[in-house]
From Swiss-Prot:
Oligomeric form and interacting partners: Monomer.
Source lineage: Bacteria, Pseudomonadati, Pseudomonadota, Gammaproteobacteria, Alteromonadales
Protein name, as recorded: Formamidopyrimidine-DNA glycosylase
A GO BP entry: base-excision repair
UniProt organism field: Shewanella halifaxensis (strain HAW-EB4)
Gene3D superfamilies tied to this protein: 1.10.8.50, MutM-like, N-terminal
Gene behind this protein: mutM
Binding site for DNA: H90, R109, K151
Length: 271
């Protein structure tokens, strides 16, 4: 699933082609995504795109009339192509631009979303209760320590909770906990302040590094130019269950936590 770095890489890739460009058409070939594409989404036709932003794993395409909200789901991708480019399987939506280009949404598994919001997007049900962005000053050690106080859930599940902090999915939660030396099953409310400070720092550092590397390509993700990301080459634990720890040489353990694969080193991340 594309996580925050992959969505941010996509935003950076498509923004120069979208901002200040007029939308001439919205072609919906298959509206049956995670939620049906609403007819009202076509209100973007004739509008000039003012900005392209990211909130968590959502892309926000702003116009004077409203905002298109895009979620890549499990396997979605956005590419900028000449509008005349032949359609391939799973190319569900084209946002056609006056420049002759199109923003094409491809989603094999159809867990993505393409929605429209006329309200300030902060009021939209999908966005209104999201936690802070991890790469901003709002996500800091005192905040996280307070957010986790008295929580008995595993720290990894809390780190992946969008109400606590947005965009830290399974890949980067595994990596950040390893870097901070915290066992993923540790009770969140019992992790001490020193470890929380290290964890916040590692989350920021790992996400920033992943963005710089173009995201993580494991199977489906490509950027707006169709190129893969290279952060997978730097993964220490995710997807490496049963292999040796890059830090101590011990075999990495793999368990299911919240139905997600969780890999850790039982020596470097003691419970």
């Amino acid at each position: 699933m594309p996580e925050l770095p992959e969505v941010e890489v996509t935003r950076q890739g498509v923004s120069p082609y979208l901002i200040d460009n007029q939308v001439t058409d919205l072609i919906v070939r298959n509206p049956s995504l995670r939620w049906p594409v609403p007819e009202i989404a076509k209100q973007i036709i004739g509008q000039t795109i003012r900005n392209v932003r990211r909130r968590g794993k959502y892309l926000l395409i702003d116009t004077d009339a409203g905002t298109t909200i895009v979620h890549l789901g499990m396997s979605g991708s956005l590419r900028i192509l000449p509008a005349s480019t032949p359609v391939e399987k799973h190319d569900h939506i084209d946002l056609v631009l006056a420049s002759g280009k199109a923003l094409r949404f491809n989603d094999p598994r159809r867990f993505g979303a393409w929605l429209w919001c006329e309200l300030p997007e902060q009021a939209h049900p999908l966005l209104s209760k999201l936690g802070p962005e991890p790469l901003t000053d709002a996500f800091n050690a005192p905040y996280l320590l307070a957010a986790l106080a008295n929580k008995k859930k595993a720290i990894k599940l809390c780190l992946m909770d969008n109400h606590i902090v947005v965009g830290v999915g399974n890949i980067y939660a595994n990596e950040a906990l390893f870097a901070a030396g915290i066992h993923p099953q540790a009770e969140a409310g019992k992790v001490d302040a020193e470890r929380i400070e290290i964890l916040v720092s590692e989350v920021k550092q790992i996400l920033a590094s992943a963005i710089k590397q173009g995201g993580t390509t494991l199977k489906d993700f490509t950027n707006a130019d169709g190129k893969p990301g290279y952060f997978a080459q730097k993964l220490h634990v995710y997807g490496r269950g049963g292999e040796t720890c890059t830090q101590c040489g011990h075999l990495l353990s793999e368990i299911k936590l919240g139905q997600r694969a969780t890999v850790f080193c039982s020596l470097c991340q003691k419970l």
